[in-house]
């Protein structure tokens, strides 16, 4: 896999490799530092909402390593080299050209605009990839910060759904054209 990195003024995003996912799941901070060059908050654990899907991501990476950019990305502060969270795609674009994006910050890094900055950059990256026409996210109606991030990056609500675990979920989306116009 090539060394893909996306940079913003304050942040760097890099797709997690199979070895990095293994170290994260094992809680091995020294190995993570060696593999990523990034310091992780203690105790070593995936960012919120990433713990459950990470074993599945590991299996996908084992089968299709070339798809690593379509799964989980580590978000780190460029200046301090600290892990602040994760942004993830739900896999490569579907037949309609849509990809799903999700994001989570470690608690101590919430409220600093990192999620908005990272998600905006990753949406821009996604639209540079062949076949991507739309980026979507799902946010529970009660998760005001997630809704705010979606709106701040130019997404608009397009549907709602019911989730057994979290209740009503809004589906937000942005198209390649709308993303360029909001830049």
Q: What is each stretch, according to the model?
A:
Residues 98, 136-137:
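Short, surface-exposed beta-strand segments enriched in small/polar/acidic residues
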Residues 150:
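Conserved active-site tyrosine of GNAT-family acetyltransferases
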Residues 1-100, 104-108, 121-129, 142, ...:
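GNAT-family acyltransferases
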Residues 113-116:
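Glycine-rich acyl-CoA binding loop
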Residues 137-147:
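Conserved beta-strand-loop-alpha-helix junction that forms the acyl-donor binding cleft
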